[in-house]
């Protein structure tokens, strides 16, 4: 009885001591952690709120240079024409003429293409383009009287509305000038002699061939899609060496034998 009683007491002691050991918390160094104070949570909350306040206070200062930079970038932005196309405008009227812009402000057409007929068409806005002579460095313009001329500065008179016709030709009408009563647009046109016509003329209509221009732009050379493969040439095997045979001395041909004919009679 005494042994069994002692065994039961020992087991009960082990069972009671196990929960007490589990409640102890150990730090990474193996030492028991100090008890947590309820006031520490409030202290940590105070520190976090102070940190958030300092960061929020410093954020407007950091953001202000960025806002100033964006404003300076917006103010320094300059408009630049886009969609540049370099080529010539061919009018199908008469024998056919290329639109030319002269340095002195004259505008007409020439049957043969020249440096004066090299034009640069660039987009200003949706459907609105400008036309500049590459050689003369002047812009095609239409005055309030409908006369075509070249302008050194790009103004509203230099803006034209580009439209694509069903016959693959284009028409160019002034973006600001038109007939006030009827609202008819004024078009860029050439007559049969290659001279510029007034846009306000009642005969200048989008259906007439004098207003039809075919853009002839220089297409960029497309890269070749094919490629060549160089195969190393196979060297022919050397011919087998043949021993040189000594040439036999030439034999002299024997002298011809002469036969005498003998005639026997009777």
Curated annotation (Swiss-Prot):
Subcellular location, principal: secreted
InterPro entries: Fibroblast_GF_fam, IL1/FGF
Compositional bias ranges of the Low complexity kind: 38-72, 244-256
Signal peptide boundaries: 1-17
Positions of region (Disordered): 23-81, 228-256
PROSITE patterns cross-referenced by the UniProt entry: HBGF_FGF
Name of this protein: Fibroblast growth factor 5
Organism expressing this protein natively: Rattus norvegicus (Rat)
Gene: Fgf5
């Amino acid at each position: 009885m005494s042994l069994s009683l002692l065994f039961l007491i020992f087991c009960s002691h082990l069972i009671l001591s196990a929960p007490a050991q589990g409640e102890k918390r150990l730090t990474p160094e193996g030492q028991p952690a100090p008890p947590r104070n309820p006031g520490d949570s409030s202290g940590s909350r105070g520190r976090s709120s102070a940190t958030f306040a300092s960061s929020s206070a410093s954020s407007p200062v950091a953001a202000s240079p960025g806002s100033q930079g964006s404003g300076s970038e917006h103010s320094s932005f300059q408009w630049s024409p886009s969609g540049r196309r370099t080529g010539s405008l061919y009018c199908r009227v008469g024998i056919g003429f290329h639109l030319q812009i002269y340095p002195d402000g004259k505008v007409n057409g020439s049957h043969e293409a020249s440096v004066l007929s090299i034009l640069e068409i660039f987009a200003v806005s949706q459907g609105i383009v400008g036309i500049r002579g590459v050689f003369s460095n002047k812009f095609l313009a239409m005055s309030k009287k409908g006369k075509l001329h070249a302008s050194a500065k790009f103004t509203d008179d230099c803006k034209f509305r580009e439209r694509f016709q069903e016959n693959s030709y284009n028409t160019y009408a002034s973006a600001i000038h038109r007939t006030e009563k009827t609202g008819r647009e004024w078009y860029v046109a050439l007559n049969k002699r290659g001279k510029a016509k007034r846009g306000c003329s009642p005969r200048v209509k989008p259906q007439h061939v004098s207003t039809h221009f075919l853009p002839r732009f220089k297409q960029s050379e497309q890269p070749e899609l094919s490629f060549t493969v160089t195969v190393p040439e196979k060297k022919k095997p050397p011919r087998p060496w043949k021993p040189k045979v000594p040439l036999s001395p030439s034999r002299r041909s024997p002298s011809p034998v002469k036969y005498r004919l003998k005639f026997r009679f009777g």
